[in-house]
């Protein structure tokens, strides 16, 4: 496929970006051809995690070492990621969907619209109930927003209801969901959004 759909996955370190990609790819790869690009600062650890998970053959996963400023590689100078896309398509010219995982960064990180067609931003409840109120650009501008690790809410004193209300304030009608990716809670909502809002748009 000459022009696959590209979805960026952003969020802070430990929020669940790699796990989200693993879970989504495991489901969608049964129906379509997928590739993944991971961005890490000085290692290719996320690439190794995905390879070891077995959700895709190693040739369909490319790790990019971004150096000290990971958000630059997905926005101001995305040349390494564009090169990785080209390499994926040389390896597998049938790829229909590519996930690009950003290096863990702050709440302001966003993807260049030239690099991705859609973006998902993920945070986790353990970062605190107040995180949605901070309204970082990654959360505000992403096409889909995920609040992960709902099981930790009682342990950190976070109200999921309050987080939902705060999210609606800064996102308006843009979609979001809660997840517990350890148990796949909320995963269907993410899959449904991808199939409905990205894959159909790409085919229209």
Swiss-Prot record:
GO terms for cellular component: cytoplasm. GO terms for molecular function: GTP binding; GTPase activity; nickel cation binding. Its main location: cytoplasm. CDD domains: UreG. One of its GO terms (biological process) is urea catabolic process. SUPFAM superfamilies: P-loop containing nucleoside triphosphate hydrolases. The keyword Metal-binding does not apply. Coiled coil: none annotated. GTP binds at residues 11-18. Keywords: Chaperone, Cytoplasm, GTP-binding, Nickel insertion, Nucleotide-binding. The keyword Protein transport does not apply. It holds the Pfam family cobW. Belongs to the SIMIBI class G3E GTPase family. UreG subfamily. Homodimer. UreD, UreF and UreG form a complex that acts as a GTP-hydrolysis-dependent molecular chaperone, activating the urease apoprotein by helping to assemble the nickel containing metallocenter of UreC. The UreE protein probably delivers the nickel. NCBIfam families: ureG. Facilitates the functional incorporation of the urease nickel metallocenter. This process requires GTP hydrolysis, probably effectuated by UreG. PANTHER family: UREASE ACCESSORY PROTEIN G. This is Urease accessory protein UreG. It comes from Staphylococcus aureus (strain NCTC 8325 / PS 47).
